[in-house]
Amino acid sequence: IPEASPVACGTRKRVPEKKTRDILSASGKWEVTKEKARVTFPRVTELAGAIQTSDNVQAGFIWDSTAKQFGLKSIPLRELKNSTSTISANITTATKNPTWALRFARYLAAPEKGSPLFEKHHFTPIQGDTWVLEPEIVFYCGGVNREAVAVALKRFQEREGCLIKTQFAGCGTIVGSIQSGQFNMPDLFMTCDVSYMAMVQPEFTQPSDVSSTRVCMLVRKGNPKNIQTLNDLARAGIGIGTTDPQMSTLGALSHAMFEDLDIKQSIQENKSIIVTSPTAHELILQMEGHDKLDVALVYEANCQHLESNVEIIDIHHPLAVATQNIATARQSKFPHMMTRLKQEVLSTQSHDSFINHGFQWEGPDTGQ
């Protein structure tokens, strides 16, 4: 702005001046700008009106949307290039009806509803969620998380007024479904292990870690076969159970450890693997219901409610840990709702649920 041009600002309590002050202070130009301000106004619209009608004020710092509403000429400044501000609808903690409050907030931002009205008044709309009164969310989730994540899903459904259609399965099965085409794409995917998110990462936003659990060996009470390490599984006469390595993260990690320790060939020659189940839950049922299995490789998180006729043997191997993460599908019609669902899964209440179900917490610090 030339030195001869009078300048006006909104009052210091108003957002435009604070935004202007913060940005111009970074470039060392705020003080000289403030000194040239002849007058301040309590509201941005009053400032815009003064620029439009007054001979004493020829320029001012206002929102570009306000300038367009008053038919004023905007002069883009390099210093203000990143001076955008987001209008948000915020649900109060005191509300007695959060579901309808959230619906109204979604309505305001929906491209089919409120968004065109904001654009009509010269605001730049965000890409809001598709408007549906009761959205149906498709959530693919690794089976190991089923019980731990249930609390978060129930709470979210009740608050948001949506329906979450869950598909729990081995991550090999889930990834195969995702890779088969867009008609099998979920809105949100939570893995059994981060390695499976990596297989489909281009289809998803940046994932967030949630939890982790270790692979362990489940043996008979008293450990009659004296199984102490994975290397002991190479001995003849030991009946081994794993989950399917093609369908399950747990099975893939188990067989990867066999290969890394160079015992896979011995296990195959001894025909030791006599049970291969789709899920750890089914494998544990086999272990508890029949005596043909001497050892089963499962997650620690699967072992919270076991009968007393089995024991857990720890596995000390770098591959004996699975980390669960979560991400939103890029093509989801409800990206903002998915952000809130992720926040629910990463909340303090969810932290407690995962810990109670035998997981280690890998999400944000909850102060617990």
Model-identified regions with their sequence ranges:
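Exported/periplasmic ABC-transporter solute-binding proteins
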Residues: 1-167, 172-186, 191-213, 219-368
